[in-house]
Structure formats: structure tokens, C-alpha cells
Amino acid sequence: VLEQVKGVEKHYFSGPHPAGNVGVQIHHVDPISKGEIVWTVDIQNVALIGRFFRTGRVDLRKIVALTGSEILEPRYYEVISGAPVSSIVRKADVRNASDGHGYRIISGNVLTGRRVEPDGYLGFYGNQVTVIPEGDHFEFLGWGMPRLDKFSVSRSYFSWLTPRKRYVLDTNMNGGVRAYVVTGLYDKYLPMDIYPLYLLKAIL
């Protein structure tokens, strides 16, 4: 369908997150300067606008992805914008839901979404619901363990010996507030041609 759209300029993006973020895409297509404003609309809202002009009715139906390591069978659901997240999650098989382990529901993805309670609601612009382990457990002297089952982008843990292993990440921060350490990892992973460390220092 998108390939048949006329009168528009098309740009194609691929790669890992955050290649799909509109801010990153704008940065690479036509970077904005101070004081400029850019309007964006996603494909589902284009369809919403089209249905309104075609029928004269506001139809807020949308497709939402139910994802996350705690969902045994990720899939898509048709819902109304602002629907209760319970109406989506209860249709799925949630891993460990019956053995007392908690899980966190996120309206959106794990990096940019927001936590919602089981009786909460999907955000108007939300296209995804993510369910991950709550991380309400603690390790005794975890800092002194080899951490063979913990993910790290550096070689802090011995898990770098198994680079193909897939991990189930939870919300446990493994400690409290720590000092900001300059490691160069922000420069390595940020997909923009800026100096992230200087930006973070200016913000802090």
C-alpha cells in the first residue's frame, strides 16, 4: 500500500533500534535547527484521518502489538485508542503469571514507553503493549558474581563469552543511584552525529 502512495517523497530506513524513531529519521533526512518545528503523523493516524474524511465519523480503531518476553505468543490486536491494557493482556498467555512472579506492563516499548498498571489504559498514540518481568527480586553479593546469565554491552560480565545467547531482561536496576561514568558507550550507540557526553553534561 505504501509503495503506491503518490505525491510524496519516500525515505527508507533499516537497522536496530532506534532506527524506527521518527526523531532519528528526521535527523538524517533534514535535520532541524533551533526554533524550527516539524509535524509528524504515523501510518495508523493517516488511516484514521482518511476514514474521517471518507465517512464523516471519527473511527479510533487501531492495530496494537502485544510483545515482551513474558508473552508466550506475541500477536496483533484491533482495539480502540485508549483501550484498557487489561483487555489486551488478558487475551494472551503470560509467562509465570500463576506462580507469584510479577510482571510489568508498558504502554509502548521498553525504552520509550511508560509503565501502566493492570487497570490502566493504552496511550492515544500507543501502538504497542510490552510485558516484561518486574525484577522484584534481589541477589546477595550480586556484584561479586561472574554473572554468566546477565547481559552487558561491555565485558563487565563473563556473558560476553556467549555472544549469541538471548536474554530475558527485567526492570531490576541492580543497585541504587551511581556516579555517571564516562565510557564512550553513548557515542558508540547513539545514531546521530552529535556529542552525547557533552550534551548530557550540559543537561546535568
Give the location of each predicted region:
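Buried, small/hydrophobic-residue-enriched core segments of structured protein domains
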Residues: 1-204
